[in-house]
Amino acid sequence: MQTLRFDNRFVDELPGDPDPRNQRRQVLGAAWSAVQPTPVTAPQLLAVAPDVAAMLGFSPEQTASPEFAAVFGGNALLEGMRPWAACYGGHQFGQWAGQLGDGRAISLGELVTTAGDRWELQLKGAGPTPYSRTADGRAVLRSSIREFLCSEAMHHLGVPTTRALSLVTTGDPVVRDVLYNGNPAPEPGAVVCRVAPSFVRFGNFEIFTARHDLTTLAQLVDFTIARDFPHIDGDVDARRAAWFREVCERTAHLMVHWMRVGFVHGVMNTDNMSILGLTIDYGPYGWLDNFDPQWTPNTTDAQGRRYRYAQQPAVAQWNLMRLADAIAPLFRDVTPLQAGLDHYGDVFLVAHEAMQAAKFGFVRQGPDEDALITEAFALMERVDIDFTRFFRALGDAPAALGDASAVTVLGDVFYDATLRDTHADALTAWLRRWHVAVGRQRPDAATRRTAMHAVNPWFVLRNYVAQQAIDAATAGDPSQVRLLLEVLRRPYDEQPEHAALVARRPEWARHKVGCSMLSCSS
């Protein structure tokens, strides 16, 4: 492992914190603070993502070694690593929250692979930093498993995301109050190694504008363009304008992907928005079970539902507006910023329409297809239909319906038998109209099935499935975590031997903590 090459441009090229103390404080005029991971008692590898390890240059023998667990548990460093925590702020639930920063995430370094790709390796749960505020800098096994699995699940679904290399248990208890209701309890501790080209967020830019530090703001903007958007050229004004436009475009495509797979992030604060258009910071996330566009998995958001499924594209645009506000002082004319925001809306509308058409098997979408799609979502919500299983069942619809009813064709997608029976005729009428319309565009049922199954996953990481793996791992059995890691690598392929993992949410999980609603406790 000592042959790995690190080139830590973030700390080499951006101003750092001159104060070496690892004490909670306001950090001014700096993009980062040097900080060492805090060692743990007994680092032990629980799981590793083999394709991420191979991408980074780690062999199976290396990932199985005690040295690997020590490094990625926070007890050792490799040559060339130069750990840091980043300074950023953010808008949380619509309100400016001031300095936030990496309170328990410590970046080890920027690894450059033999292919020339640059990957930042970041430990989450590696101990306190100057940005930890009142927290301990640690993470529990429960939330670490969720982040580890979801990072990889999203990648294999084709959704832009940070990756996860490893999950290491620490041997140390971490006290958390799961529901913030005054009942703290010790839980097993863990450290996840997250991997991305960059972990820079919208909030990294916001903090400097809020502090009127335009010098550091300009340095960060120009550094980000040079390192992470090297294809953008022109003079400084043109580069900055093109960069913001591309950030808007990437964010629009990210939102379309979330809507496609039924993913709800849960905490779309500006400090959780990647400048690269990646899904970042997996906390109280969830996938839709029954189709409910007003659903959010986050207990903190249960009343206002700011970050509900249907609202995510609008929130992303609001967050881009906050980013535009942050970088506006660098523009003599803010017209390019408004153009970028407009571009977000244009890109999202076109891509979202194409995505919806593809989910329903259409090659193109006109007024008739529009009406069918709108009616389908209304029925799915009214009848309490499982989002993921509905689209897979639709893809499996036979070439000829004959006299088959929607209940027969759709099968086990219903959560409420009474609602199913009440609306059976309406569902069948819709199904027949859809079958005629899609048949005009894709007359061959096998071709249609292949196309629909390519965009509608068979497997998504449902909260209740993840929670079962968490419960087992907490009791000392990591086999379910490792099984899920294998299954999620082929989310569009039917894996009959693992059919239990794609069952619609069981009734016992409807209101169970960790299965339906989650807090930010981690």
Swiss-Prot record:
Keywords: ATP-binding, Magnesium, Manganese, Metal-binding, Nucleotide-binding, Nucleotidyltransferase, Transferase. The active site is at D271 (proton acceptor). It comes from the Bacteria. ATP binds at G101, G103, R104, K124, D136, G137, R194, R201, D281. Its EC number is 2.7.7.-, 2.7.7.108. The keyword Transferase applies. GO terms for molecular function: AMPylase activity; ATP binding; magnesium ion binding. Its cofactor is Mg(2+); Mn(2+). Pfam families: SelO (PF02696). It is an enzyme of class 2 (transferase). Belongs to the SELO family. Nucleotidyltransferase involved in the post-translational modification of proteins. It can catalyze the addition of adenosine monophosphate (AMP) or uridine monophosphate (UMP) to a protein, resulting in modifications known as AMPylation and UMPylation. This is Protein nucleotidyltransferase YdiU. It comes from Gemmatimonas aurantiaca (strain DSM 14586 / JCM 11422 / NBRC 100505 / T-27).
